[in-house]
Amino acid sequence: MSNLDTQSIINTISNSKKQTPVRVFIAGEKLYQLQIPNEIEAFISPTSGTLFGEWKYVKALLESSSQITHYRVENDSRNSAVPLLDKKEVNARIEPGAIIRDQVLIGNNAVIMMGAIINIGAEIGAETMIDMGVVLGGRALVGRHCHIGAGAVLAGVIEPASAQPVQIDDHVLIGANAVVVEGVHVGTGAVVAAGAVVTKDVPAHTVVAGVPAQIIKRVDNTTSQKTALEDGLRNL
């Protein structure tokens, strides 16, 4: 279970220092003469360079430095409350375009596909695949060896505030474009059909479908064969 409860996440966002980080490419003459403040990280040659830092400091430098004749600013957030996760040492496969915020836990050999959005406090178990375009809301908990299908949404706890997160147990398959609402617990080995809207707990080893989702049967051999996961996709 996550160490972050709902109020802790809300407090983290509310009290964090909001940031507008930028990367700026500059050109000019005698750039080595620039008076660069400590808040800005700079890589400079006499006629070109790159600056990294908070926009208010970089903006002030650009406006006050006659040595800079041209510049280009790259920026992808404004007053951001939570930074993105540093993915370099995560023992998982994370494809380009996945957006993962800080304070997310990702288990060994998990797979995060393109376009997935994973919010603060979420946990993803070992060997679980988060498919393309999935949204894991704040503090959503997903167990081991699951598949969360493309476009599925596991609701977060932040707004509206919910004391209990979505909890997906081990070996669960969530079909494409399914929605699991706040506080729902999906039991071990369950299957949620594509497009289902899950508004109440799902017992282990059952299949649910529909809007709202209803139990349609127990998981049997046929279901297990149709929903079997490919472990080779989880190799690193």
Swiss-Prot record:
It catalyses: (S)-2,3,4,5-tetrahydrodipicolinate + acetyl-CoA + H2O = L-2-acetamido-6-oxoheptanedioate + CoA. Keywords: Acyltransferase, Amino-acid biosynthesis, Diaminopimelate biosynthesis, Lysine biosynthesis, Repeat, Transferase. One of its GO terms (biological process) is lysine biosynthetic process via diaminopimelate. Gene3D superfamilies: Hexapeptide repeat proteins, Malonyl-CoA ACP transacylase, ACP-binding. It holds the Pfam family DapH_N. NCBIfam families: DapD_Ac. Belongs to the transferase hexapeptide repeat family. DapH subfamily. This is 2,3,4,5-tetrahydropyridine-2,6-dicarboxylate N-acetyltransferase. It comes from Pediococcus pentosaceus (strain ATCC 25745 / CCUG 21536 / LMG 10740 / 183-1w).
